[in-house]
Amino acid sequence: MTHSEPHPATLPPLDEPTRCLVRLAAVIGAGTERQVRAFLLEARALPPDWVEEVILQSYLFAGFPRTLNAAREWRRLSGAAAPGADPDADATVMAEEWRARGQVTCAHVYGDMYEHLRVNIAKLHPALDHWMITDGYGKVLSRGGLDLVRRELCVVAICALAAQDRQLHSHFHGALNVGATPAMVSGTLDALSDLIDDDSLRRYRLLWGHVRTAHTKLAQGKV
């Protein structure tokens, strides 16, 4: 299975490795350096590719400084050297493929809202539309090493801890669209309960409830 395709929802509500991963994603994006260090220590029990990919994708949501800090700490704590090369990151040969697979992955994530999204982002700036597809969904979120369901759950986690409500709403939908079960999304919020203040967590659970209800009605043909 390529990672531009939905991943079958065969996970339990939130298995312990995935719980560890979403917590790591959240603190890389919006936690303290001490939290990042502590959660990376725990992450040594995870498949290394998962950790590498969560660190790499964090630059889309948290910027290069936090990504570089996490990567540096991961190299130190894991003792694992960086790969000697990464052909999938070479723009001179991959640019066209990034755009093609980015369109596919973004369409999976946004479903029926995909065309509307493209129009709205282009109205903000055409460069943002190009970068969203080519860099965000093509170059980064379509990489191998981590399935799209876990990637989306990690995006939910980072948006929640960073208090990015609008993006959180979008990626609640996105997680369901790519195959996450409602229990997985609920489990992701539960995994952050010691990191997010009670008022915010209550608000996010309410928002998630609205999204879940909307998806249920859509599946039943009631809307």
Where do the PLM segments sit?
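Short, structured motif recognition centered on aromatic/hydrophobic residues
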Residues: 21-27, 151-159, 188-192
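Short conserved catalytic/interaction loops centered on acidic-Pro-aromatic/His motifs
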Residues: 39, 165-173, 186
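Accessory, usually C-terminal, subdomains that scaffold auxiliary metal cofactors
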Residues: 178-183
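Beta-strand segments within the central parallel beta-sheet cores of soluble alpha/beta enzyme folds
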Residues: 52-56, 186-190
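Acidic, glycine/proline-rich low-complexity segments that act as flexible tails and inter-domain linkers
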Residues: 1-19, 29-50, 59-148, 177, ...
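Short, glycine/charged-rich beta-strand-loop motifs at protein surfaces that mediate ligand recognition
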Residues: 157-162, 175
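Alpha-helix capping and inter-helical loop/turn segments
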Residues: 31, 163-166
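Short Gly/Pro-enriched loop/turn and capping motifs at secondary-structure junctions
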Residues: 160-164, 194-195
